[in-house]
């Protein structure tokens, strides 16, 4: 009798702990369920040019900066997420496309020096420009006062989409009168790189101005654009590569009246502008 009574007392004392553990497991299952994705959400993006996450170009993460493009022959997705789950901000304003949810890197193509000042974060990391995204987020700082004073000239050669690239960037830095100006010009040209029937012609520009009134207030204006025309390549079957005796075969091009023509020519120009008022809050006042 005493043994049964003692066992009943022990069970009665352990019931709250067992109930709490069961409730914790249930909450854990509910939390995990909120992070489940359907197959359609994780499908591959048909547009290969947009498969790179905004985080790939992050220069403050050793791993991400080494698995990005960097003239590499392959692409990378952070944790396998589609690029629509990564957010790109410019001066604190989100620039993901409203229809596709993805950021078009053609919007800032050829402006490598002007867009070099950026901050990248992982999924839901603490930051000062967004609530976060499951694929991470990046913010490009185009404020003219944040560029170092001076000029830079860049000349590059390649045998891929374009053959030659030239960029020139000049910045006054923050002057004594509180003004700062930055400008950048770029041009990329290619007349058939390593793939036949591919041409590339792109001009890019950036102009930024900022007026710093005091330590707490400043007004910034930035405008940029990249008018581009590019001939595209289309995927082909292994049989087509075998018959052409080349893995660089492009079915999009051919001759018409003795001149080369391409069936898919993309002409893109999305001029953009951003105006921002920067207010540094003083917690002591």
Q: Which residues fall in each region the model found?
A:
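Short coil turns and loop connectors of transmembrane beta-barrels in diderm outer membranes
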Residues: 16, 84, 147, 175-177, ...
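Short, polar/charged loop or turn motifs at beta-strand boundaries
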Residues: 27-53, 65-66, 75-80
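Extracytoplasmic beta-strand/coil segments of soluble accessory domains associated
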Residues: 53-93, 123
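Short acidic/polar hinge/loop motifs at secondary-structure boundaries
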Residues: 55, 64, 93-124, 141-143, ...
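Extracytoplasmic loops and strand-loop junctions of Gram-negative outer membrane beta-barrel proteins
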Residues: 59, 120-122, 150-154, 188-192, ...
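Transmembrane beta-strand segments of Gram-negative outer membrane beta-barrel proteins
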Residues: 115-120, 135-137, 142-157, 181-185
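Transmembrane beta-barrel wall of Gram-negative outer-membrane proteins
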Residues: 152, 157-190, 194-233, 265, ...
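Outer-membrane beta-barrel and related beta-rich outer-membrane complex signature
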Residues: 195, 220-258
């Amino acid at each position: 009798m005493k043994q049964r009574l003692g066992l009943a007392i022990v069970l009665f004392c352990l019931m709250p702990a067992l109930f709490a553990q069961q409730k914790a497991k249930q909450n854990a299952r509910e939390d995990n369920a909120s992070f489940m994705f359907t197959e359609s959400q994780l499908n591959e993006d048909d547009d290969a040019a947009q498969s790179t996450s905004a985080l790939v170009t992050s220069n403050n993460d050793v791993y991400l900066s080494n698995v990005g493009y960097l003239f590499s022959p392959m692409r990378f997705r952070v944790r396998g997420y589609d690029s629509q789950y990564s957010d790109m901000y410019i001066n604190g304003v989100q620039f993901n496309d409203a229809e596709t949810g993805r950021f078009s890197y053609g919007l800032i193509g050829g402006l490598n020096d002007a867009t070099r000042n950026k901050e990248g974060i992982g999924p839901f990391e603490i930051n000062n420009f967004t609530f976060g995204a499951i694929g991470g987020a990046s913010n490009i700082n185009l404020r003219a006062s944040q560029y170092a004073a001076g000029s830079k000239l860049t000349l590059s050669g390649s045998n891929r989409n374009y053959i030659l690239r030239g960029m020139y960037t000049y910045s006054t830095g923050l002057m004594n009168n509180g003004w700062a100006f930055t400008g950048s010009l770029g041009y990329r040209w290619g007349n058939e790189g390593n793939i036949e029937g591919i041409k590339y012609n792109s001009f890019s520009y950036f102009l930024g101005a900022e007026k710093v009134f005091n330590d707490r207030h400043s007004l910034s204006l930035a405008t940029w654009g990249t008018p581009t025309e590019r001939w595209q390549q289309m995927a082909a079957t292994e049989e087509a590569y075998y018959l052409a005796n080349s893995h660089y075969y492009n079915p999009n091009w051919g001759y018409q009246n003795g001149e080369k023509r391409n069936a898919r020519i993309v002409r893109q120009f999305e001029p953009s502008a951003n105006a921002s008022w920067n207010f540094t809050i003083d917690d002591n006042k």
